Amino acid sequence: MEFHLQKKATKTNATTISIEITKPVKNIKLEPGQFIEDIKLIYTHTNTIRKIGTTNYTIVTDNSNIDNFKGIENSSDDDDDDDDDDDYNNNNNNNNNNNNNNNNNNNNNNNNINSNKNINSNNSINNSLSNNSSNINNSSNNISYIGNSSNSINNNDNKLSRSRSRSRGSAKTTSSLTSSKRSLDSRNRNRDRSYTRSRSRSRSRSYSRGFSSLSRSRSRSRSISSRSRSRSRSRRSRSRSSRSRSRSRSKSKSKSRRSRSRSRSRRSRSRSDSRSRSDSRGRSRSRSDSRKNSKRQTKSRSRSESRLPDKNYSSKRHQNSRKRNRSYSRSRTRSWSRSRTRSRSRRRYGGRTFRSPRRSRDDSRDRGRDRERDRDRNRCRDRDRDRERERERRLRDRNRDRERDGYRERDRGRYRERGGERERNRNRDRDRERDRNRDRDRSQSPHNEKNKGFLSSSGNKIETKLKSPISNITKYSDMDIDNNINNIINSNNINNNNIKNSNNINNSNNNNNNNNNNNNNNNNNNNNNNNNNNNNNNNNNNNSHNNTNGNVNGVSKTTSSPASDNSTPENISTDLDSPLLKKNQQLNLIKEQTNKLKTEDSIDESNNNGNDRFKTKCSSTENENKNRENEKNNSENSKNNPNNNNPNNNNNNNNNNNNNNNNNNNNNNNNNNNNNNNNNNNNNNNNNNNNNNNNNNNSNNNNNPNNYNNNNPNNNPNNNNNNNNKNINKNNSNNSNNSNNSSNSRNNSNNSNNNNNNNNLNNNNPNNNNPNNNNPNNNNPNNNNPNNNNNNNNNNNNNNNNNNNNNNNNNKNNNNNNNSFSEEEEEEGSLNQVRNISPKIGKYNEDISFLEKEWNRLGNVQNDTNSSPISQQLSTSSSPFKSTGGSNDGNSSDIIMMESNNDIINDGGKKNRVFKESQVVQRESLDVSKFKKSKAIFFGEGWIYRNHRKEPCVSWRFNNNTPPPDPRLNRDYINLRYVYE
């Protein structure tokens, strides 16, 4: 899984995160800041994800896998039906049902995650995702994927932004295009009505006064339908009027009386018109005002005449105002429509601002000059008064008609006429609504109090569930955490299985084993106790380790993680000898034991501490108690079980089952490799094949689209398991009572005999004393056969089901064969591989070989783990983590809790922080003195806090701005990232 966190310079663009998803997911709600890891997902609604911590993220990846997804469904429920998991884990359904029985939905999800990760690690992401590809694209209404489904958020946004930009743009433009579009029809109707009305009035009045040409031109101009036409005409008439005015200006006083009277008549008309135009807001002037103006303007006649052509008035302000006023007043043919239109469009921007130029000196000069030359000054005043009154009536009629017809003027009701108040209210409401919508869309941050979660562009919370093994969508709700660290954000799994069920989440992985366990309910009941526990143990061992490595980290992540650009899940999963598998095995051990320790003490402590986050996670106190007990048992088993410590089983079959990618099943796949060639198939299709595990040994290969088995010769129980899986299936069928399929028995051997596999576990576990251990499953050639079938030493690992009782022996065999490590050989064999690969790491060039040593010991040594330097490196001191249950003295176990989005989903999005729920990140005490700052170190997906900023972390692709690259040859097998200052 790769994150390319690149900050973009712009404020609006989010940081892009390139993600590959390798885990199946049950229910997914994408909150802002959530990301789908294994899908090529683009999450482009920048308003929505603009705050993760404090940074913008856009989740962007390429299109390659999107076609394989059926899709995400919108759902308001945080917990979707298990049927969905069963649906997309159809291969996994049988065993997932068992997982559902044994473990919670998280188990299903984890089974899905495990099986699907396993699927993902091989071909099955493509296969199983292709089964599910349509729904994601379908649900992409809310989430836009890069490829085919990039419609959703972007489209909703685009729709919104288009409509918004329409409304905003119309508000901004000085042109009246928008309002003309909106009111064209109504205005035409209004004009038709007001045309006849005003025409009759104007004729009756103006004909009597001898201005028939004026009223005719006015009524003619009123019939102009669109403002754009009147605007273009006003341009023409403006030029004509300016020419005519300049001509009239240039005429000397000695011109004939006729020419002066002509220009005077034009000017007098323009004077009254411009004055009424300036009063188009409905402010009529009294007669005394007009007299005052006329007196005031006659005084300046000679001066204004002399200055009119002068260049003192050539400044843009006066020129523009003069031209504007002339264009209204001069050409009488269209002056009315033009004055009305222009004044309205200007009034939009405040109306009053253009009033003074409208009554500028030019008009006053013209009026004064005309009055002085006019013989009948009173007649002119009366004419102007009548025109003003007529214009006011027209304004009132127009406004009344517009309001009656629903015309919405964009000037926010600045009229004083009748209906102005109503229109003002309507405009105010419309504008408020527009602003509300705009603000709502802008404020879709998860931190916005309004939204409290991911909102679609329509303001609805997006809740999506992937109905397919699209893998690790780090969903905060019902997704099972592979490893608490791997799926750090998948704390919802913790909800179901409780944080201890992070082991149970790992158990959900081992719920695949639990499927085996359920299948081997005899074995798996022991193992479901131990498999819920030993699934916690083995899940921690198998699932957390194997899931982390085999499922997500082991194979899928290695395939998807940046450094292994060449490695595809098929390549990695099939290459049993690849160092990645060994690495994955070792890391699986580390992760298993971290999960053990976390779930063991930290969950109890955190739950006992009354942590609300844990309470929100835990579906119920019963689940908490059960999970607590399971995890205690599991942790005890896991501590006692070298399987937890046996990367041999895990890693042996991680080698085998890394191919199976059911490292979860790998431990069980040790036995599950016995059967997880069958049960890896079963674990691949442990969900399926656990029911069919006998068949799944063969059918797992067949049933697993993963065909990890097919890819794994081990995973190909068809190869070995088909041979012995036939035996296994036979033996499974022989042992099917314990394991519904003795491959389940193997899984039971792996699971119950996870207790038997936990013969590392079960060597120490009384489960080894379980009849499961005593079961013919253990004794079954199935267990022995898959042991024989899977690897010779994986057979021994499978025999480690039986021989995992001698897992040290078989694991030695497996260590010899699988490069997995027994407790005896942990210090020797397990470290050499990683030591060869990555001798030094980090700023201090520390030998990280102790990592594998210490983590291999973690399962057995309960209190020594805190003193291990791993705890110092792997734990983080950054403030976003809350350490609970211990001091940093190096001796007390410390849970570093990370806040994730889980309780947002649990609360239905009522909390506005994305990462509200704490999650077990690391159970270690920090020795911060060793580092300047250990920013954050995780196993697998999750958030990394850098500079108090939460950023997604699966496996970092380091660039100049990010932490130093991991010196190990291939960084991909481990999700553990050391981030130094």
UniProtKB/Swiss-Prot annotation:
<feature type="compositionally biased region" description="Basic and acidic residues">
    <location>
        <begin position="270"/>
        <end position="292"/>
    </location>
</feature>
<feature type="compositionally biased region" description="Low complexity">
    <location>
        <begin position="170"/>
        <end position="181"/>
    </location>
</feature>
<feature type="compositionally biased region" description="Basic residues">
    <location>
        <begin position="314"/>
        <end position="358"/>
    </location>
</feature>
<feature type="compositionally biased region" description="Low complexity">
    <location>
        <begin position="207"/>
        <end position="227"/>
    </location>
</feature>
<feature type="compositionally biased region" description="Basic residues">
    <location>
        <begin position="228"/>
        <end position="269"/>
    </location>
</feature>
<feature type="region of interest" description="Disordered">
    <location>
        <begin position="65"/>
        <end position="133"/>
    </location>
</feature>
<feature type="compositionally biased region" description="Acidic residues">
    <location>
        <begin position="75"/>
        <end position="88"/>
    </location>
</feature>
<feature type="compositionally biased region" description="Polar residues">
    <location>
        <begin position="605"/>
        <end position="622"/>
    </location>
</feature>
<feature type="compositionally biased region" description="Polar residues">
    <location>
        <begin position="554"/>
        <end position="576"/>
    </location>
</feature>
<feature type="compositionally biased region" description="Low complexity">
    <location>
        <begin position="867"/>
        <end position="891"/>
    </location>
</feature>
<feature type="compositionally biased region" description="Low complexity">
    <location>
        <begin position="491"/>
        <end position="553"/>
    </location>
</feature>
<feature type="region of interest" description="Disordered">
    <location>
        <begin position="592"/>
        <end position="834"/>
    </location>
</feature>
<feature type="compositionally biased region" description="Low complexity">
    <location>
        <begin position="89"/>
        <end position="133"/>
    </location>
</feature>
<feature type="compositionally biased region" description="Low complexity">
    <location>
        <begin position="635"/>
        <end position="820"/>
    </location>
</feature>
<feature type="region of interest" description="Disordered">
    <location>
        <begin position="491"/>
        <end position="580"/>
    </location>
</feature>
<feature type="region of interest" description="Disordered">
    <location>
        <begin position="149"/>
        <end position="463"/>
    </location>
</feature>
<feature type="compositionally biased region" description="Basic and acidic residues">
    <location>
        <begin position="623"/>
        <end position="634"/>
    </location>
</feature>
<feature type="region of interest" description="Disordered">
    <location>
        <begin position="861"/>
        <end position="891"/>
    </location>
</feature>
<feature type="compositionally biased region" description="Basic and acidic residues">
    <location>
        <begin position="182"/>
        <end position="195"/>
    </location>
</feature>
<feature type="compositionally biased region" description="Basic residues">
    <location>
        <begin position="196"/>
        <end position="206"/>
    </location>
</feature>
<feature type="compositionally biased region" description="Basic and acidic residues">
    <location>
        <begin position="359"/>
        <end position="452"/>
    </location>
</feature>
<protein>
    <recommendedName>
        <fullName>Uncharacterized protein DDB_G0287625</fullName>
    </recommendedName>
</protein>
<feature type="compositionally biased region" description="Low complexity">
    <location>
        <begin position="149"/>
        <end position="158"/>
    </location>
</feature>
